[in-house]
Amino acid sequence: MTSLKSLFLSFFLVVALGLALVNASEPRGPKITNKVYFDIQHGDESLGRIVLGLYGKTVPETAENFRALATGEKGFGYEGSNFHRVIKDFMIQGGDFTRGDGTGGKSIYGAKFKDENFKLRHTKTGLLSMANAGKDTNGSQFFITTAVTPWLDGKHVVFGEVLEGYDIVDKIQNVPKGRNDRPLKDVKIVKSGELEMEADVANEGDKKGSHNEL
């Protein structure tokens, strides 16, 4: 009987150790520190809300720039601006709230700011990354990936991801377009702001001039 108990005990210890090793080996993603939203309208049609999580631990300056532009707390920002460039199976681009054509925009730090780091890669759909016109030319323009885009690694700073509303991103990438990949009807951010963080959202990441060109 004693040997049988020892056998069962050994079995449970092996199982527990195996589970611990699996959990320890799971890849841990960047921590989400802030959550912002865009309410989107296409022409006269309301598409709904996109909720975005920001990686404020990994890229704090870039995440703070986007957060403040989403709230408009500096007196300028994303509300009322359009997604001016949309390419199916690649990305949707917005954030030019000064000119609206991909040649404008500005950051909360001035016209442009440096590439903070390239620790994060473009490994999945729904990632939020900075559009730019070359090295250290970040302003306010951004894009959301609709494909895995490894050729952008080391050139564009990834700083967040879509938490809710990727179906809306998918609708945007499929709208009719004209010249320069611009939607024929405006795809507008009619309202934007910051949402209260919840504990599960905060830990989600741990579980898992010239045109700005990509």
UniProtKB/Swiss-Prot annotation:
What EC number(s) is this enzyme filed under? 5.2.1.8
Signal peptide (from-to): 1-24
Which Pfam family name is an example for this entry? Pro_isomerase
| Places the protein is found | Endoplasmic reticulum lumen
| Positions annotated as glycosylated | 138
Q: Which CDD domains match?
A: cyclophilin_ABH_like
* Catalyses which reaction(s): [protein]-peptidylproline (omega=180) = [protein]-peptidylproline (omega=0)
A Gene Ontology biological process in which this protein takes part is: protein folding
* Swiss-Prot/TrEMBL keywords: Endoplasmic reticulum, Glycoprotein, Isomerase, Rotamase, Signal
Which GO CC annotations does the UniProt entry carry?
cytoplasm; endoplasmic reticulum; endoplasmic reticulum lumen
Q: Which residues form the PPIase cyclophilin-type domain?
A: 37-194
Main location per UniProt?
endoplasmic reticulum
Database matches in InterPro entries = Cyclophilin-like_dom_sf (IPR029000), Cyclophilin-type_PPIase_CS (IPR020892), Cyclophilin-type_PPIase_dom (IPR002130)
How activity is controlled: the entry says: Inhibited by cyclosporin A (CsA).
Q: What is the role of this chain?
A: PPIases accelerate the folding of proteins. It catalyzes the cis-trans isomerization of proline imidic peptide bonds in oligopeptides.
UniProt name for this protein: Peptidyl-prolyl cis-trans isomerase B
Species in which this protein is naturally found: Emericella nidulans (strain FGSC A4 / ATCC 38163 / CBS 112.46 / NRRL 194 / M139)
